[in-house]
Design a protein with these regions (language model features):
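Amphipathic protein-protein interaction modules
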Residues: 67-125
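Short glycine-rich, low-complexity/disordered patches
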Residues: 40, 64, 91-94, 156
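A recognition module on extended beta-rich or small alphabeta surfaces enriched in W/G with H and D/E
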Residues: 101-156
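Generic structural signal for hydrophobic core residues of well-folded globular domains
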Residues: 54-57, 83, 87-88, 128-132
Length: 156
């Protein structure tokens, strides 16, 4: 009964997390209903499918932060992150150099070499449960896409 986001404490732990990305995503998808699994195709639109499932399953952020839900939270965060990364061309990273950093110990992804653009999928999943719009993940994706395209166009 944790009620807190689980943070990573080492780069080795992060590298292990990355190395198991495909297996963890496969295990997460296998736990979902078949009709939903078929709709999670890695597209930006599938973020809405995932968000609808999250909203139906979890009435509050605290509900997904329970220890027994850790694999669902991790799986959902991985799925969201991989959709962003694959569609927008980003890279995963972990920052452990500043404990006051907002995403300290939380895997994040970034997209631009010359302008830092961090997004962390785990807080995106929990914020979608707080906002409860059913459109939050896709809205953030589209905003990130616009920002990235604009910045890439300005880079030499």
């Amino acid at each position: 009964m944790s009620k807190r986001l689980r943070k990573m404490i080492s780069h080795e732990q992060f590298q292990d997390w990355l190395a198991h990305m495909d297996d963890a995503l496969e295990a997460f998808l296998a736990r979902l209903p078949a009709e939903m699994r078929e709709r999670l195709d890695g597209s930006p639109e599938s973020l809405g499918v995932l968000e609808a499932w999250l909203l139906e399953r979890y009435p509050t952020i605290d509900a997904i932060l329970e220890d027994e839900e850790a694999s669902h939270l991790d799986g959902a965060a991985r799925y969201v992150g991989e959709v962003f990364r694959r569609m927008l061309g980003g890279h995963w990273r972990l920052r452990l150099n500043n404990p006051k950093y907002v995403y300290y110990g939380i895997p994040e992804f970034w997209f631009l070499e010359k302008k830092d653009t961090p997004i962390a999928s785990l807080p995106l999943v929990t914020s979608s449960l707080d906002r409860r719009t059913g459109k939050h993940l896709l809205l953030v994706f589209n905003g990130a896409k616009e920002c990235i395209e604009r910045n890439r166009a300005q880079q030499p």
